[in-house]
Amino acid sequence: MKQDLARIEQFLDALWLEKNLAENTLNAYRRDLSMMVEWLHHRGLTLATAQSDDLQALLAERLEGGYKATSSARLLSAVRRLFQYLYREKFREDDPSAHLASPKLPQRLPKDLSEAQVERLLQAPLIDQPLELRDKAMLEVLYATGLRVSELVGLTMSDISLRQGVVRVIGKGNKERLVPLGEEAVYWLETYLEHGRPWLLNGVSIDVLFPSQRAQQMTRQTLWHRIKHYAVLAGIDSEKLSPHVLRHAFATHLLNHGADLRVVQMLLGHSDLSTTQIYTHVATERLRQLHQQHHPRA
């Protein structure tokens, strides 16, 4: 069992080097694969001897035991990547994960905010304080660009061009994209860079665009906490909140105003159009609600 766990660590190291996956993803893979190794060990199996039927039984057992479909899908992804790696490294002569059936995932619509709610959220920070001026600029950039939370906290000074009005983003899989900022975001970035950021840095030299109060790179958890703080001030229902609430609003509002789906896909940094298409369902649902509220025969 120790040898199998060691191979998992080798695999995760290789995955980090090749794919530049987030630490949270790697830790989730580590937990899932360690659980799988223990499950195999109790059945007298190892990574070298496990067969497709064994892996399928593991997935089925997880689902029947109350595992969420999304968790099972993540487990399947980890298992597939691991055995592809073992096959590529010639530890195995076959890949038993090649034909595993995927669990059916329920289609969940992203939590979205109305344009009026977003406006209230953006107006919540008190811009006469450097810290809240930073937060105002962050919220404006999030809504203007649709960036992921992890992408925003990773931005550096060299990633933005206020003259050109664009931001350079390094997204999932280390893929780079340029996203327009828009006039409002550019204005608040300029204001923050002049009146907010120098106060936050207090003489510390750091390239991070949005530093923490301690002049370090902000964590995703801190940003999420700040979003929730302003949402409460704006009177927004907590059930409508998620770390990517402004990303979802960005996509939905663009589609509501007639944006092309593939343009939205490019701006969001989605590799698969089907990932973007879920926002069309949000827009359609919004239209249906408006129809029911205002049409005399609805």
Swiss-Prot record:
Q: Which UniProt keywords apply?
A: Cell cycle, Cell division, Chromosome partition, Cytoplasm, DNA integration, DNA recombination, DNA-binding
Extract the SUPFAM superfamilies matched here: DNA breaking-rejoining enzymes (SSF56349), lambda integrase-like, N-terminal domain (SSF47823)
GO terms in the biological process aspect are: cell division; chromosome segregation; DNA transposition
Q: Where in the cell is it found?
A: Cytoplasm
Q: How is its activity regulated?
A: FtsK may regulate the catalytic switch between XerC and XerD in the heterotetrameric complex during the two steps of the recombination process.
Any Pfam family the entry gives: Phage_int_SAM_1
Q: What does this protein do?
A: Site-specific tyrosine recombinase, which acts by catalyzing the cutting and rejoining of the recombining DNA molecules. Binds cooperatively to specific DNA consensus sequences that are separated from XerC binding sites by a short central region, forming the heterotetrameric XerC-XerD complex that recombines DNA substrates. The complex is essential to convert dimers of the bacterial chromosome into monomers to permit their segregation at cell division. It also contributes to the segregational stability of plasmids. In the complex XerD specifically exchanges the bottom DNA strands.
Q: Which family does it belong to?
A: Belongs to the 'phage' integrase family. XerD subfamily.
Output the PANTHER family linked to this UniProt entry: PHAGE INTEGRASE-RELATED, TYROSINE RECOMBINASE XERD
In Swiss-Prot or TrEMBL terms, this protein is called Tyrosine recombinase XerD
